[in-house]
From Swiss-Prot:
It comes from Solanum lycopersicum. Belongs to the eukaryotic initiation factor 4E family. Component of the protein complex eIF4F, which is involved in the recognition of the mRNA cap, ATP-dependent unwinding of 5'-terminal secondary structure and recruitment of mRNA to the ribosome. Recognizes and binds the 7-methylguanosine-containing mRNA cap during an early step in the initiation of protein synthesis and facilitates ribosome binding by inducing the unwinding of the mRNAs secondary structures. Key component of recessive resistance to potyviruses. This is Eukaryotic translation initiation factor 4E-1. Displayed sequence is cv. Mospomorist and cv. M82, and confers susceptibility to potyviruses (e.g. potato virus Y (PVY) and tobacco etch virus (TEV)). Keywords: Cytoplasm, Disulfide bond, Host-virus interaction, Initiation factor, Nucleus, Plant defense, Protein biosynthesis, RNA-binding, Translation regulation.
Amino acid sequence: MAAAEMERTMSFDAAEKLKAADGGGGEVDDELEEGEIVEESNDTASYLGKEITVKHPLEHSWTFWFDNPTTKSRQTAWGSSLRNVYTFSTVEDFWGAYNNIHHPSKLIMGADFHCFKHKIEPKWEDPVCANGGTWKMSFSKGKSDTSWLYTLLAMIGHQFDHGDEICGAVVSVRAKGEKIALWTKNAANETAQVSIGKQWKQFLDYSDSVGFIFHDDAKRLDRNAKNRYTV
């Protein structure tokens, strides 16, 4: 499913359910006389009332995290400036949060903004992330907003065939541009990782090659770590 289509699907899911509750289209009875008013059925009225209050749950709960560059220093441990921002579990709560936070193009230089499955911290040391790795895409400065949104929609909408492998994603704002990284659990599972990388490129219509780096390699070799997989 294309990213734009996922966005429309999540936005109009409630409308489709309402249509189904109304018998699939709400056609006018052929025997009604001209000018006669069709009364709303009790079932439809009841469903409409529920749709106003009932939210649409996601497969998993997710948490936004912000790493504030103004509190970072070389003397503090990595991740000490991470702050839990908001946890959401429904489509409506996601949009409520997303529409009220800064998008990557508006974040300050050096900022990292994360979205991870609830109770997974965006750290290499987290038990769920420890044996994983990351796919990474690069963007020109101020050009990652749409790709960040579509990455979020693909994750929380459970669009990946190996969605259980995904821990979360982070967008990083730097002087030379922006990067989006997709974190996964089991780096050694090549089949799952390659599938995720290919689908991610497809969802974002991203044409450049992307590489996958093991967390273990990144910890040992830092910027000298090499891609283990490329798609």
